Amino acid sequence: MVLVCASSSKCKRNTFLQLAMVLFAVVMARIALYFHNHLDEPLVDPYDANGNPQFSEANALKHVIHLSDDIGYRILGTIEQERAREYIMNEVLALQKQLQDGPNADIHQMEVSLESGDGAHRFDFMNKYVIKKYQNLKNIVVRLSNGTEACKEEAVLINAHVDSTLPSPGATDDALAVAILLEAIRIFISRPVPLTHSIVFLFNDAEESLQDASHMFITQSPLRDTIKCVVNLEACGTTGSEILFQATSNEMIKAYSHVPHPFGTVLADDVFRTGLILSDTDFRQFVQYGNLTGLDMAVVKNSYLYHTKKDLAPYISPGTPQNFGENILAILTYLVSPEADLNNMKSSGTVYFSVFNSLFFMYSKLTSKILNTLVGGLGILLTLRGSEGSFTVALIAQVISIAGIFVIPNIWAYILGNVLDCGMSWFRNEYWPLFIYLPAIFASLFFTESLFKRSEHLALRATIFIFSLLTFIPLPSAYLFTIIDFFMVFALFLNDKILAKPGTVHPLTYFIGSIGAMTVGFESAINLLEIFVPLTGRIGTDKVADNVVATVCVCGFNIYFPLMSPWIQRFRSRCCFRLGLLFSIFVVGFSSFILAKQDTYYDSLHPRRIFVQRMENITSNEVSLHIASADSAPGFDKLSSDLSSLLTDEPVVKTEMDDWNSDWDTVYPFSQFLGSYRIPLNDTVDVTTLPSIKFSNKVVKDNVVNVTVTVEHPGLIWTVVSFDADVLSWSLPEVPSTVRRHHVREVSAYGLDSYSFNMSYLEAPIYFDFVGVDGVGHYPSKASEGRDRASIQLCEKLTNDYLPDWTDTLCIGVVSGNFKLE
């Protein structure tokens, strides 16, 4: 994107330097991408040539395939979840017998238990409160120790969840983690090395229902008080290395430092804590209720298939299970050794990051402050030394330049999404946004840099001064600015002392000054793109996706090309600036036009998520179809209208999604991100066994009512009751006193169909809204068993005949009703 002006002798003289810098940037990016995407060859044999046990991807995939392909959709409350649990228990018991019959029976002790229980907890998400109630959940718990009480009293917990969510068979989320745990058990019992600390393997029953089974374990398990730390395994992608995105103690980060394929950064930790990812894991329950520290790790690349029907074993990239499994083995091997101090698990602000998936660095919060202060302080001193009034002007110009590359691309992003209605045209590829927003950034640079006449050296000093200030940001992820700034400060020092004449910049300064940016900085920029571009397909219908991605591109550009402003000033000429600006604008327009004119912004491997439910209301006797989307790309309104015209003569109705619209309460609080339409159907309600809400033991005293509420939901799963009331107390977790709208989501094991809670509230009529998913009315998981259901028939028809192949549909039958408590 750096232009050569043919009519300018200055541009001609510097053509070689321009090309050299471009080549340097490309080569560095190519090297970084190679290591970023590199995965070792998967292993097949469970033992190496010397007979030592090793992680076998082939073994792990057998478990993944059985759970996700053979058993399929492991939805809590269905028979498939019971079958998955039975399969895992059989595998665990077989491993236990293998240990008992093998040569290591006197070295290891393996205890297996099935822990069940009921409970409730409050789940807060994006300023929403939901009460979770669960019944008869069953966790498979395996403790591996040397048989002594001392070993058992200091345990490492490693967690994976067995269930999957609608509408996903959950190969990576989270059958892969389950398979890794099974492989880890096999390997540890095959090693003739006694454990100093025990390992508790938790195959938890319910994560997708908002982390119920992990809550049950950490609040009810007999082993909970022995747990000293936790390693949580998750996935939202299908390819690449798993990332360490939460690490909360120095000792656990030290454990991670032993992995053969490190890929983690405290920057991911800081981003995750902002809530921008709109996701959470079981790790939250272990921290909140167990006061544990630990590691949270997940496969995140290619999250286009997250929670879709294509989360299947064939889409897991070869090498991903091997990479993940070997890293987990290294972590556990350290944690069960005498070297690990499990009594030193205090939370810390340790800074950590990896480079090229090969090198791992960690240092304390104090060390971080010292390094940041030294590098930043030195940078400020060097840039301010001998400063004159012109530096102030250069600094103001640099601030305006940085502001420009944030503002101008975001203005264009707003126009694309909100004016031209062609937002998210780049969705199918994590790197396609660069075709639009990279030239927009250069256009901004050429424009703003042309406004101020400043020397190249002053522009360099101003750039380094600003990056030096960034090192003082009070976040662990400020390490990134420190590394980038270190090389720039070092380059400036060499330039001023050795390489160049006073007030000039030697070309080598740019190459030296860009080393940090084009290594650690590039990895960070790529990670942001790979996380946020697929994420825009599920962040809601507000038209902000292009602005989010434009901002990510700008941040990535500043991280990778921090010295672009002085570099442009090096070739300053009116001709170069004009041509650069015009060419950049042309590329922006051309790229935007080409991408916008695609027939669709999606394909089968990068699908649009569509949420469909056929709702039968037993109170109004109305049947309706609800169709919703979770992204802001164009076309959904037309898709809904076309669908309506195929099914009925009734007009489609746009519904307002708020806390008082219970249509999508089955996915509350995620429902707040949906844009939904309601299509009335000319069908009759055909619910064989009606749900009900019954009220008993009612006592009224001094305007306060005490009552027992019993919800009966035969044949329905994932039920929700929502209502407005001034609740004074109840047998459920407390909510803030300012909250009047309450949502109680209930899940239970297969076969249970009722639950109760006691409530005390200020006397006034209460209107309960009830919704529940038909236990055999979700498609395609129950396509065969529920083929006589109208919801299954409709879902099948929609999927096969109406909806494009670039959609991925959650399609369910829902029963709703309204009940009044006088």
UniProtKB/Swiss-Prot annotation:
Co-factor note (free text): Binds 2 Zn(2+) ions per subunit.
One GO biological process term: proteolysis
Site (Transition state stabilizer): Y306
Enzyme class: hydrolase
Superkingdom per UniProt: Eukaryota
Lumenal topological domain: 36-365, 414-431, 485, 536-547, 597-822
Amino acids binding Zn(2+) 2: D173, E208, H307
Keyword vocabulary terms for this entry: Endoplasmic reticulum, Glycoprotein, Hydrolase, Membrane, Metal-binding, Metalloprotease, Protease, Transmembrane, Transmembrane helix, Zinc
Active site positions: E207
A Gene Ontology cellular-component term: endoplasmic reticulum membrane
Amino-acid positions noted as binding Zn(2+) 1 in the UniProt annotation, renumbered to this chain: H161, D173, E234
Necessary cofactors: Zn(2+)
Keyword flag GTP-binding: no
Glycosylation site positions: N146, N291, N617, N682, N706, N758
Coiled-coil segments: none
EC number: 3.4.-.-
Parts of the chain that traverse the membrane: 15-35, 366-384, 393-413, 432-452, 464-484, 486-506, 515-535, 548-568, 576-596
MF terms (GO), sorted A to Z: metal ion binding; metalloexopeptidase activity
SUPFAM superfamilies: Zn-dependent exopeptidases
Gene3D superfamilies in the cross-refs: Zn peptidases
Residue numbers on the Cytoplasmic membrane side: 1-14, 385-392, 453-463, 507-514, 569-575
Main location: endoplasmic reticulum
Family: Belongs to the peptidase M28 family. M28B subfamily.
Protein's recorded name: Putative endoplasmic reticulum metallopeptidase 1
Species annotation: Schizosaccharomyces pombe (strain 972 / ATCC 24843)
Recorded name of the encoding gene: erm1
